């Protein structure tokens, strides 16, 4: 009887948690749309807004429906949307046309690029290879040299890599508490300190790289 009650309460909690996650993601979508609308204070882009907002609303609804059984995905995407809202509200933005285009493109990627393929791909790689890859990334991030104020092609490439790594680092920071993926941190901290922000199971690395794809598209 106690076991049955435990099962009942467990599934009740799971259902409630899932419902709350869907609502929180939808709320983040609403805040994003409001922030986009607020960029057009004088109504110059009224036609553009009337065209784009229904598309974005539909994308958010479709994402909620597609991932309603995978709350960790919705929580990650919620973090991305919240970060975008914050950047828009802080005037870290481009033209309204470009911002609508970036949001639409990012949400389209969330719908059509499977996070499960990323997770599967990383699960097929041994933990040793993943840790080694992260170690190499960390080394690349720190290996930037400037000679006489002049950069050669390799140095420019290194800077571009650093920019990409910094973006990944930012999404890790944003997502840590909300994703609840803090597992197996210790073995990674020794080789890639920035990755300590996320406890890394091999599958969760794949998910984070998928999430970084969405993050890069929307920023």
From Swiss-Prot:
Keywords from the named record: Glycoprotein, Membrane, Signal, Sporulation, Transmembrane, Transmembrane helix
Cellular location(s): Membrane
UniProt modification remark: N-glycosylated.
Main location class: membrane
Induction: During sporulation. Repressed during vegetative growth by HST1 and RFM1.
Null mutant phenotype: Displays elevated rates of loss of heterozygosity (LOH). A combined deletion of the LOH1/OSW4 and IRC18/OSW6 has reduced dityrosine incorporation in the outer spore wall.
Presence of keyword Transmembrane helix: yes
Similarity remark: Belongs to the OSW4/6 family.
Gene Ontology CC annotations of this record: cytosol; membrane
Identification of the protein by name: Outer spore wall protein 4
Glycosylated residues in this chain: 42, 62, 136
Organism name: Saccharomyces cerevisiae (strain ATCC 204508 / S288c)
GO process terms (BP): ascospore wall assembly; chromosome organization
Membrane topology (Cytoplasmic): 192-193
């Amino acid at each position: 009887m106690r076991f049955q009650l435990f099962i009942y309460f467990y599934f009740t909690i799971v259902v409630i948690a899932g419902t709350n996650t869907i609502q929180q993601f939808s709320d983040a979508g609403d805040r994003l749309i409001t922030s986009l609308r607020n960029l057009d204070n004088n109504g110059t882009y009224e036609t553009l807004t009337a065209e784009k907002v229904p598309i974005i609303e539909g994308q958010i609804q479709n994402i909620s429906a597609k991932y309603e059984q995978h709350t960790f995905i919705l929580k990650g995407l919620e973090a991305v949307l919240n970060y975008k809202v914050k950047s828009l509200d802080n005037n870290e933005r481009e033209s309204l046309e470009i911002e609508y285009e970036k949001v639409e493109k990012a949400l389209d990627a969330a719908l059509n690029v499977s996070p499960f393929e990323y997770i599967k791909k990383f699960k097929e790689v041994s933990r040793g290879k993943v840790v080694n890859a992260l170690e190499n990334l960390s080394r690349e991030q720190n290996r930037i040299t400037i000679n006489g104020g002049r950069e050669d092609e390799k140095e420019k490439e290194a800077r571009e890599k650093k920019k990409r790594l910094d973006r990944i680092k930012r999404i890790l920071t944003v997502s840590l508490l909300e994703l609840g993926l803090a597992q197996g941190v210790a073995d990674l901290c020794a080789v890639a300190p920035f990755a300590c922000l996320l406890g890394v199971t091999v599958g969760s690395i794949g998910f984070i790289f998928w999430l970084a794809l969405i993050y890069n598209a929307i920023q």
